[in-house]
Amino acid sequence: MVTSHLLCGAALTVTSDKLVDKKFWSAVEEMEVTHFPGVPYHYETMCRLRLERLPLTGIKTFTQAGGRLPETFKERITGYTKTTGSKFYVMYGQTEASPRMSTLQPEMYELHKESVGQALPGGEFIIEDDQKKVLPVGSKGQIVFHGPNVMLGYGASKEDLAAGDELRGVLRTGDTGFLDEDGFLTVTGRDARMGKIYGWRINLDELEREIEEYLSACVVQLDNNIWIGYLDSLDEESRKELLNAVTQKFSLPVSVFKFVELNAIPTTSRNKTDYNSVLQLIKDQAQK
């Protein structure tokens, strides 16, 4: 982010103030910031602070990467940018790809709300199965990116640095997803976030996304149970409605789902859900 902007002749505003501090927004206003790059945590916080109350009218471009932003927040931000004439770009990337791989153009949002867009010029996505066989359009599998921006390899020693180009422009992302007929990519989760209940493979990220239609939550597996850690109040009627939706979509019995109320969803230093900490909280709760 820093390098690309400096190469384009842009100036950067750097502050140690937090997003919830008045000083942060004073700096945005005083320095006449025109581009705001953020991760999901930033945009969720801005929505909770109420976008209309923040000094954002000078910002022409909002960009979002660093993980999946729930649909409700994307809708709010897109709606806000339409009233101000600014633009909101959803992006997808990894550090190993320097780091951007796709962008969803604002004018395509209404047609592809769950997508992270098409590959950047010069790049290409394919979807592979566990045997590295290319899958057809619409099939879910591992996302593989081909492009000139893919790194040479990981360097932990002088020998690694001397190894040359080990990846040869091909990055197996470890993410799962699918492509449509126009090349728009939808990310459904991480390979590492695949659970198995009674022999049935479950994409925990996909399940979490479905649950987020009802409440703010995170999902982990512990033994043969799916635990839902939630923040919002959850009455019995809402619980039944949620369970009815997810059991039908994922073909799981109601008995595998357990609920636990959390004071906050733990996050990593990069403001992503810390699932290891969530799992520990649930283990502690289960032992009580």
Enumerate the language-model features and the residues they cover.
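Short, conserved charged micro-motifs
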Residues: 235-242
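Conserved C-terminal "lid"/linker of ANL adenylate-forming enzymes
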Residues: 195, 245-288
